[in-house]
């Protein structure tokens, strides 16, 4: 059985005074923490390989560009705002 192409991760974020959510680091499924060097862009987008829709953050981690997605929760009765995920790299 192949692992899911969508990898949910824990993300350390801060909010600007304008209300923008900015990720600072993420914890990969193996427990390793990666600092986010820079956020290049934020835009609504879908994850092509993993599926899902949300905000796509184009980030730089260790000099490499990656897409980090924030998937909004549409269940307004739930206290969870949403979840972060990355698309697993193809083997």
Where in the sequence are the language-model features?
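Cysteine-centric segments in proteins
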Residues: 1-91
């Amino acid at each position: 059985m192949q692992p899911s192409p969508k990898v949910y991760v824990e993300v350390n974020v801060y909010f600007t005074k304008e209300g923008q959510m900015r990720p600072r680091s993420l914890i990969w499924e193996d427990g390793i923490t990666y600092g986010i060097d820079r956020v290049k862009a934020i835009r609504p987008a879908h994850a092509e390989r993993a599926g899902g829709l949300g905000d796509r953050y184009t980030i730089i981690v260790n000099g490499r560009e990656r897409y980090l997605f924030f998937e909004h929760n549409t269940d307004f009765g739930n206290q969870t705002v949403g979840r972060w995920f990355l698309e697993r790299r193809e083997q």
